[in-house]
Amino acid sequence: MSVPVPEFAFELALCARLEATTDWLPARQLGGGVAARGRRVVDVCAVVPGPGFDERAAVAPGEIPAPVLEGSVGVGEAVPAAEALDCPPERREAVVERAVDLGVLERERRGGRTLVRRTTRYPEGWFDRLIAVENKPDLDRPGDLRRQLRHDAAVGLFDEVVLATADHVTGAHLNRIPDAVGVWRVDPATGERTVVRDPAALPVDEPGIEPVAERPDRTEVAVVAPAEKAQVRRRIAERAYGKGWRTYDPPPCASAAVTDDGRPRCTHFDRVVDPATECGRDCPGFERDAPPDFDPAALRDARTPWGADPEGAGRRQAGLDRFG
């Protein structure tokens, strides 16, 4: 009986490898639904840069809030935030504050109202493709794998969908998943991948069919329009751009270390660990100490096209009201 491969370590190894061998921007744990947005979470989403990527990189290092991109805020005359941003009043101020902090909005106050304008135009076409990767290192423990992959293939939200596994892949395995889904066999230690089957391009510009609820006797579905998919695709790309995959903090332990590519490693167990679930007082190797140095932004800046501190037009123009 084989020893199970921890999914967290497997996922990080793959992200690190993709980062080292492509110009993609991998990010972890992103929503992958349209009609039922909290129902599907994708393990890894890789953003493939498009022709306008440098323009996007020059705007801001973080995720631009969706209400700013989808609202009626332009680069010309300042408009009332309450009218231009489609979000609950209790959230609006935080959205404006975040966008101003990023340098994508200027803010002013007139007559007790908050007015906003964009500092620069948003570059369309900055990403070329979105690639969803479902990690299942052990195919003998598939869980909801078949349902998840069928969902992704039917919705067509991502340009390509791939199953990543550490197992030997048989014809029987391939027959259980949609033909459009690609398969990678991934070394769980290094993240090195072998293509077992290439993914097919999914129809992202066509309507999709999304399962939204499952009953004992039927599955309820929703038809998602191309415009809805395009909006969610941009949200996913923005989320991935701002989030990345190093979304953890090393624990305050003498055994804690960080690999050169930024994965949390335990010297006591000599392996990559998940700080959120494996570290703490209950661990036999725990010895309280200062956590190791860890700068995920610097690592990402050095290893990808993403920039931690862009000198873009948005930031320069935002200097007028930064932010009062």
What would you call each of these model-derived segments?
Residues 133, 162-164, 182-184:
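Hydrophobic/aromatic beta-strand patches that form the interior of the parallel beta-sheet core
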Residues 2, 16, 20, 90, ...:
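Non-catalytic C-terminal interaction segments of nucleic acid-processing enzymes
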Residues 39-40, 127-128, 156-159, 179, ...:
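Structured loop/turn residues at beta-strand edges in well-structured enzyme cores
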Residues 43-144:
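Conserved catalytic cores of phosphodiester-cleaving nucleases, focusing on short active-site segments
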Residues 34-58, 173-175, 180-182:
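Internal hydrophobic scaffold segments of catalytic domains
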Residues 1-23, 27-42, 55-57, 68, ...:
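Nuclease catalytic cores
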Residues 142-178:
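Short, charged, amphipathic alpha-helix that recurs within catalytic cores of restriction-modification
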Residues 33-35, 120-123, 150-152, 172-174:
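Short, flexible, glycine/charge-rich loop motifs used to bind or transfer phosphoryl groups or to couple energy/partner
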